[in-house]
Amino acid sequence: MMGRQSGQISMLILDIEELIPENHLLRKINQMISFDFIYDLVASYYPTNGRPSVDPVSMFKMLLVGYLYGIKSERRLVQEIQLNIAYRWFCGYELGEKIPDHSTFSKTRVRKWNESNVFQQIFLEIVRCCIEQRLVDGKEMAADGSYIPAEVSRNSWIDVEVEVEQSMLSYLDDLNQELASQPGFKKPPSHTVTKKITTSTTDRECGYIHHGSKRGVGYLLETTVDCKHGIVTGVDVFPANEKESLLILRHLEQQQKLLGLSMEKVALDRGYDTGAVHRGLELLGITGYIPAIRFPNDPSKYGFSYDPQQDTFICPMGQSLVYHRLNCNKSTGKYLRCYQVQGDICKKCPSREGCFDTAGARRRILASSCYPAFYRGHLRVNTPEYLHMMRKRKIWAEGSFATMKREHNLSTIHKRGILAATEECLLSAMALNLKRMVKAVFSAVFMDEIWAENMISQPIRYLCQQVQYLTLPVPPATISRKAASHRFSLPGYLSGIETAFPLKTNT
């Protein structure tokens, strides 16, 4: 007999939470973290009288759902929450409740949260939760910057002249004080210079970049990732024409102050290979791993070697060039370290004509203002620790950018202004952190349950096979024995324990 739906209307008393699967991502997020702290963060932006507003926690959760599931349009986000029961439950709305209009997002953002650091505080609170769960330890970190294009027409690009305040001190305060104590340092008065830049009439705060294949206007996203579970611990946004090496030290220092995070090792890319960055990392108590740049005026190309114990260069004739003073490079506004030969030794040297200009009295070398730290940093290149950190940087730093751009609405910046761009980047990083937080915690809980259920009733060999099967991306039968042994070595290690201490199998 063929069945057919009657279509009869029925009354049903239903708890919406019962419809959400136990393994749903939003249910796991709701179990792990409570967002009630947002009420205290935004309390000062709401008056004590008048009509009740939309719940700020529900408002934030709705935005978070959009970034978790790659829903960039706020109009479409409202439609999805209206239809999806899991989204409704996570945002705190029952089946019969009306979802706020899409214009509520923009009105709340402009009237209440636009000039605040609410999203930054929420991001930091989530990171603190990860630290409490021991998902972040600071032992191995990776930092990098990435260009995020702005959603503007190329026809809106214009060249404008702006006045920029030029100062020769732009790193850490401790590093600036250290430079100020050296001979030859003179603090110049800050002055403004006229500079021609490319920007967009649509978004005046974005910057222009032309580096290799990257060309356009947008923003520079600077992030730091903990390599233990890939939790993003720091997010800063700048115009795309800013230089990464000038921003990284204060970016890391801010995380140490706000999170109380003790960083031990940080992996960076080649663009951060400057003496100031190497020395700044040392002052922050961080061991830096940075690929070395082969500079065209490297003294080693001309047969000079550096003695780190005496802080001197040794010329091919065996004479020492000692540190003399700091010299200011007026074209770049930075200080250089001047090393030179003492006395009139160069006048009698047979290699004088090929060593330096005959108009000079002695051989000089201009190096980075923090060359000793620069040299120490280069000694770590190609060591086993360096190669290990470079692999971690590719996985977590570059991988996090790829994931946020592909899955969490960060392929472009579609809002206007650096504050709105920062909001987008923070929400994308929060979505990534929550997913990785859930994966790390619930994977550990699941593995603990397997061990607890099988430790007594199953032999160790069979237990290890179960764990091996769960840790491999494909069943063990579909991969080679050699690949399986490299992927998971615990069964071989414990086979000797099973032989020495056999366990009886329950029958």
Language-model-derived ranges and their functions:
Residues 40-46, 88-95:
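Short amphipathic helix-turn modules centered on a small-residue break
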Residues 1-27:
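Hydrophobic alpha-helical membrane-insertion signals
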Residues 58, 64-68, 72-75:
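Glycine-rich, N-terminal phosphate-binding loop and its surrounding beta-alpha-beta segment
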Residues 17-19, 51, 213:
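Short secondary-structure boundary/capping segments within folded domains
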